[in-house]
């Protein structure tokens, strides 16, 4: 396992990563930037190359502006590749990487999923109505990658299958048709995912999920898979007590490097497609906070019911604030909480500052 502390870019941390935050990273690059187009608001969208090999890998992050964990991991990877490490040298010798760290700078600036026109770029791959989508497609066609890495964040509600473990990292080899056939490009992507999953089972056993492979030809992964290019969806999820996603960032970094190693060393066929389907499919079994016996605090709640709370991420003064909101009320059998509170237990509601907001939320509830 790589010593991550040597490669982590300490200049970018937290959840709010806009274009200004990564400008210092750009200045450290050994290669010139490539402007591939501009956003709705006229912001340059920039990419850069690393390596000189025949195996071409295109990777992009922050297609959704509020999904920044993978952007941090990409810069950690860049740091790693610039060091005098045998594997890094092999990757750069065997591969040419085209790296697009922020496809949606307008969304990143205001911490939204969509671009400035309120369009989800990951539902615009076929229609190509947005300048960011058109710039990406032009880059894809000119670079002609052999592999594509589509880098995202996922919500905290996902579990790794029907278990009490969060899906800390999830992957998908997207479908290329409604029948979800295992085409040659899908098979390659599946084997690369198996390689990453095998590695990740050491640091986070049982915490890797597989995304649903329902087909949508306006999603970028499905579109690229239709074009015959092995495409992998990476989803950075929740690690316990890591809402800033710094641990998940490390796991995404390790995953990207593992995939590049597998490509660079021609080890893809060492892995079996069948093992891809052994990765549990994501389920939605988690709340950020699961409160038992809320009727003890507020009699408006029904006895025997629980309250599932999820955090809303809000940008306040260039920081992300996590504001609790009631998501579901009911027996909630079979659900889990990243934090659980038992209202009978006075220790949980002893008014520590971290829980006052949740207590007030329960007290304000009215049917």
Predicted features, each with a name:
Residues 1-20, 143, 172-367:
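C-terminal accessory segments enriched in acidic
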Residues 24-40:
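N- or domain-start disorder-to-order transition segments that initiate the globular core
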Residues 33, 47, 99, 148, ...:
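Conserved beta-strand scaffold positions in the cores of enzyme catalytic domains, especially
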Residues 42, 62, 99:
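Conserved hydrophobic/aromatic pocket- or pore-lining residues that grip, position, or stack substrates
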Residues 44-49, 221-224:
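Short, surface-exposed beta-strand/loop micro-motifs that present aromatic residues
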Residues 46-54, 62:
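Short beta-strand-to-loop junctions in surface cap/lid or active-site-entrance loops
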Residues 54-56, 68-206, 225:
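Active-site/substrate-binding loop(s) of hydrolase catalytic cores
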Residues 65:
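Short active-site segment of divalent metal-dependent hydrolases/proteases
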């Amino acid at each position: 396992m790589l010593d991550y502390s040597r490669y982590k870019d300490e200049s970018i941390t937290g959840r709010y990563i806009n274009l200004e935050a990564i400008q210092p990273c750009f200045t450290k690059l050994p290669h010139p930037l490539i402007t591939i187009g501009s956003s709705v608001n006229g912001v340059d969208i920039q990419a850069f190359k690393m390596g000189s090999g025949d195996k071409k890998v295109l990777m992009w992050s922050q297609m959704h502006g509020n999904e920044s964990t993978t952007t941090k991991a990409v810069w950690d990877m860049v740091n790693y590749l610039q060091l005098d490490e045998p594997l890094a040298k092999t990757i750069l010798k065997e591969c040419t990487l085209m790296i697009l760290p922020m496809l949606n700078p307008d969304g990143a600036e205001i911490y939204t999923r969509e671009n400035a026109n309120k369009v989800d770029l990951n539902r615009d791959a076929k229609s190509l109505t947005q300048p960011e989508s058109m710039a990406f497609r032009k880059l894809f066609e000119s670079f002609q990658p052999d592999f594509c890495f589509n880098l995202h964040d996922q919500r905290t509600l996902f579990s790794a299958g029907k278990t009490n473990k969060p899906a800390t990292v999830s992957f998908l080899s997207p479908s290329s048709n409604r029948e979800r056939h295992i085409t040659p490009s899908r098979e390659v992507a599946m084997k690369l995912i198996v390689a990453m999953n095998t590695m990740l089972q050491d640091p986070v056993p049982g915490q890797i999920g597989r995304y649903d492979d329902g087909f949508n030809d306006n999603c970028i992964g499905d579109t690229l898979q239709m074009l015959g290019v092995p495409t992998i969806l990476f989803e950075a999820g929740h690690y316990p007590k890591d809402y800033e996603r710094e641990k998940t960032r490390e796991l995404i970094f390790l995953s990207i490097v593992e995939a590049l190693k597998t490509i660079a060393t021609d080890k893809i066929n060492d892995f079996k497609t069948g093992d891809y389907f052994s990765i549990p499919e994501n389920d939605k079994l988690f709340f950020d906070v699961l409160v038992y016996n809320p009727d003890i605090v507020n009699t408006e709640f029904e006895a025997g019911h629980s309250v599932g709370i999820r955090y809303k991420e809000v940008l306040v003064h260039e920081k992300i604030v996590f504001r609790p909101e009631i998501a579901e009320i009911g027996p909630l059998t079979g659900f889990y909480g990243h934090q659980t509170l038992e209202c009978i237990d006075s220790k949980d509601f002893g008014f520590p500052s971290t829980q006052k907001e949740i207590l007030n939320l329960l007290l304000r509830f009215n049917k």
